[in-house]
Amino acid sequence: MEEVSALKLRIKYTKLGSLRFIGHLDIMRFFQKAIRRAKLDVSYSKGFSPHQMISFAAPMPLGMTSEGEYFDGEFESVTTTEDMMARLNATMPPEIQVLDIIELPDNAKPSMAIVTASDYYIYKNEECENDTIPQLLQALPAFAEKDKVEIVKKTKSKEELTDIRPLIYEIKEYKDGVYMLLASGSRDNLKPELVVEAMCESAGVPFNRYDYRIHRLETYMGEKEELQPLSASGTRF
């Protein structure tokens, strides 16, 4: 008898509010439980200790919020995008909600292997008194025009000067803060707080990571000139 392959889905979700302090492993466990509670027909690995066949795209550092997180999952059967979203969201708090579910082609690569960029919104942390955003915005045009942005990159064994400018794809004023589109993924990866630190140095203001909130807007695949959201890999069903 021919074995039927599992269906591959990609799920987009939010991580907001106080759940920004929940780590990646806890988020994985959270979704494993949510999938069970929603009674979705997820696939399990073979062997003595079966686990759900899900994998996450680009783990987020503690303290960041997002409306553009993704994970992939294999399922034995599916209903519809709307039904599966509703069943998952009914099991979860408002801070974590599924925004979209798409079906992937059989030959689709895992999301973690195709991430190339992410964009972010940087704004004042309302829980802190310091507000250096106006100074950063004033210095932003000059910063955006720089050909080179060097930072001291620390490793376990040494410190070295690194030019991060090629990894800053776009940076501009956005709402009451800063928008930045940065390289992200296994090939090139630039943390947004490093850019904020470089901006502070350029503007001549002290850098304190806790003065700012960092919110991921979307996670992308493709080359710099032709970026697409990870949700463009498939179709709703």
PLM feature segments, named:
Residues 84-92, 133-144, 195:
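Short amphipathic alpha-helices in soluble, non-transmembrane regions
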Residues 67-121:
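Ordered, amphipathic secondary-structure segments that act as subunit-interaction surfaces
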Residues 13, 73-79, 122-128, 180-184:
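Short beta-strand-to-loop capping motifs
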Residues 44-75:
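Short, charge-patterned binding micro-sites
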